[in-house]
Amino acid sequence: MSELTRTKVLFLITKSNWGGAQRYLYDLATTLHLASFEPVVILGGTGELTQKLESAGVRTITLQTLQRDISITKEIGFMTELWRIIRTEKPDVLHVNSSKAGGVGCFIGRLARVPRVIFTAHGWAFNEDRPVWQKFIIKKVHWWTVM
């Protein structure tokens, strides 16, 4: 197949440490048939996942604004950067992993008209110990992402 017919899959995950969600994403990105698919991974930080993906030949894009903790200025920066990347990369599929990447990724992916957006939950942030108002917002965002 030629480069033009490969399906571009843009993966998004919040953290680049090595854990369950990261291992899942690594397995998906590194086992795609490269003649048919072009995997690109967007992640926060330069941890072990980044190193493993790059060693396996998977292109990564690191965002310093993509962090687990909530910060309005970082969220705006993250959304802006993600919008720019999606518009530049023009993925056929956006595969988002984890709560934060899932909520923001689905929202921006829909705005940018990505043909297919897939969300994989690796735990529910609204079950964590956090203020009630955050749990409420997180539940609403999760509801919206699956619709």
Range-by-range predicted roles:
Residues F37-V40, D92-L94, M147:
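Short active-site oxyanion
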Residues E3-T7, F11-K74:
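N-terminal strand-loop element at the rim of the active site
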Residues I85-D92:
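Glycine-rich phosphate-binding loop signature in dinucleotide/nucleotide-binding domains
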Residues T73-T80, P115-R116, A125-M147:
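Nucleotide-sugar donor phosphate/pyrophosphate-binding loop at the beta->alpha transition
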Residues V9-L10, V93, G109-W124, H142:
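Active-site proximal beta-strand in glycosyltransferases
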Residues V96-G102:
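Short His-centered aromatic/hydrophobic patch
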